[in-house]
């Protein structure tokens, strides 16, 4: 029974398993059918997708084109809005322009003009016919605004520009000359910057306005000093020699330097760097023209009083050259203008060197009479005084000397091809040239020319060589003294050999009379006679005793002739007008030539009149005293 139960259980399980298998098979069949349906749907969907893609592709491209077109339309609408905006805001900007920069405020005014300019540029770029009237209105407003800016620029500038200032107030107190206030400079600079940035041709107009306003201020401030420079050159005495620093040109130049540098600072603060030079030169032009006129007047005065006022030309040359250098260093401008103004005076200064030499030569040549006592003439001291005065202007003269070259003052000197249109710089000078050395050569040439001319005249106009010798020696001594007692000594101390040569020549001319006197002191000594002189002491008594009557008469005659000639020489020597040094030199030279001869002759023959003094007027002591008196 248990077996049966077991078999029945197994059968039931099998039936249940078969039933489950049948169910699974049924589900699998349904799944297979469903899969086939899905695959069929996918195939249809793929076919449909391809059809849709074929249709949607062109639609997508068209959509993109429509999007771009839409964006373009939006941009056009925005541009139209912007183009309409200036027209809409024109009334507001016009109100600002009409009010002007003073009331509206410069920054607001400039911003308004800039907006108008930007709007006009955009309208011109669009070139829409509908905007033509608006563009015309904007152009009119901009033109009016620029005109008001120029007027405001001039108004501000004139408001801060006095008619003139008193330069001496700033010079004497060592104060800087006034410049424009910083707030006004800022306003002027803003206006100029706008004009330059907008490429408006008003920049040149503003520069013209600036020069037109500030130029007369500079000229008026310097006018009195220019007049003073001319007036102080006028002479109360025609023969008065110009003294350094007595003309007003130094103060004039000092004021010009201060005013010009202050004005240059103004120009640099207002205008662009590339415009500084042109505007500064234009502003200073009137003052420079006045200075040039002043220098021409002074030059005419100097040329008409060259002997006494040539030194003013040297001083002016130094002053203006220094002014040019300072302004060139500070501004880089005006060198050419100042050189052109100085040129007439500088040329006069250069030519004066040769002209003064020629004038001295002419004065020597015109001498018709010379002092009969050999006294010096004023021309000698006048010539040396001129050289002494020149030393006081050694710096400008050194510059001129280098410019004309060594010997350039001589009549036949070449011009060396140097240009005279500019103030000389170091580059224009000969390398190694020494202006002081060249000037010393000029001094020596002057002295040599003077002495040569006087020597020739003395030979013609004076009665004797002795008087000519006195005259020349006096001249030499005066020249030497005036060199040694002045600043000329530093230049000529070791170069006065020519004076020593002329002194010896003059001494020889004067003491030539000693030859005539010495003839009376020569005797004939016969060495072949028994009474010839011995080497021991001279015995006058024995010598006289040994003379024959004819020889004694000759000795007496020699004493007599010597006495007369010697007294005459002493008398004339004392009558001559001699400088102390000349009298000493001549007296000593005569003593050296005659005293030894006379003492020898006296030693041998003084017993000829046995001490009566009839023939032997002087013994050795008395004649020594006379010789000593000649030198004192």
Curated annotation (Swiss-Prot):
Main location: other
GO cellular component, one term: cellular bud neck
Pfam families recorded: Exo70_C (PF03081), Exo70_N (PF20669)
Gene3D superfamilies according to UniProt: Exocyst complex component Exo70 (1.20.1280.170)
GO biological process: exocytosis; protein transport
Superkingdom, taxonomy of origin: Eukaryota
Signal peptide: none
Keyword annotations of the record: Exocytosis, Protein transport, Transport
InterPro entries: Cullin_repeat-like_dom_sf, Exo70, Exo70_C
Localization of this protein: Bud; Bud neck
Molecular function GO terms recorded: phosphatidylinositol-4,5-bisphosphate binding
Family, per entry: Belongs to the EXO70 family.
Functional description taken from the UniProt entry: Involved in the secretory pathway as part of the exocyst complex which tethers secretory vesicles to the sites of exocytosis. Also plays a role in the assembly of the exocyst.
Name recorded for this polypeptide: Exocyst complex protein EXO70
Annotated source species: Gibberella zeae (strain ATCC MYA-4620 / CBS 123657 / FGSC 9075 / NRRL 31084 / PH-1)
Name of the coding gene: EXO70
